[in-house]
Amino acid sequence: MLKLREWKNTSGHKPLIVKGCRQCGKTFSVLDFAKKNYKHVVYLNFFENPDYASVFAGSLEIDNIVMLLSALLGKDAVFEAGETVLVLDEIQDCPEARNALKFFRALKFFRIDGRYDVIGTGSLLGVKGYGKEPKSVPVGSETVIDMYPLDFEEFLWANGISEPVVAMLQKALDAETPVPEALHNRMKQLLLQYAVVGGMPDAVQTFVDSKQMDEVLRI
């Protein structure tokens, strides 16, 4: 969330691409940020509705794109200069390479136009043979943030281990000094749980809420 705020607060910021593996929390994080920081959120999901890619197959004039999106989405597409963010989810699932290429070119047009912010999310972007990613993306047309599953430290925070305790553990680890046995046993327990639960946000939240491994394994 901090990186998203830094991006928005940067003067003249470019369209943003948030990439990472599926289910690592990209869509949730982006939509949560968008709803809290913009008056209007226009949302497209190319995985659920691949036909949306056709919006970017014709003219890349921003007013034309806005008109087409307004026609497709109706009242769910409100475009107000400086108050609207366009969220393009699962951009790698554009059904045609040509449309995908024009989609990435469109980012440059949105940057030049400047009236509306654009945030795209993508899974496995840049992985050879996956999706319909264009061979090249215009240099300087976008800002990219990589998102990863929760690491062990973040897993500790989610399970109620405070930052001062984590800092103390890190200090002891660096100095190779022992910690109290009760704390050591608790960390071993959490490490084993992390090995099973993993770092995907849905799985971690389910575990935090239920403390039941069978609930986690159903995800």
Each language-model region and where it sits:
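Structural recognition of the conserved hydrophobic beta-strand(s) that form the central parallel beta-sheet
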Residues: V87, D117-S123, D146, F155
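Short regulatory helix/loop adjacent to the ATP-binding pocket of P-loop NTPases
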Residues: G126-E142, L156-I161
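Interdomain hinge/linker elements that couple catalytic modules in large macromolecular machines
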Residues: G160-I219
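Short glycine-rich substrate-engagement loop in P-loop NTPases that contacts/grips substrate
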Residues: E48-T84
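Sensor-1/coupling segment of RecA-like P-loop NTPase cores
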Residues: R111-P134
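Hydrophobic positions on the alpha1 helix immediately C-terminal to the Walker A/P-loop
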Residues: S29, F33
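Pre-Walker A adenine-sensing motif
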Residues: M1-S11
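Conserved lysine of the Walker
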Residues: K26
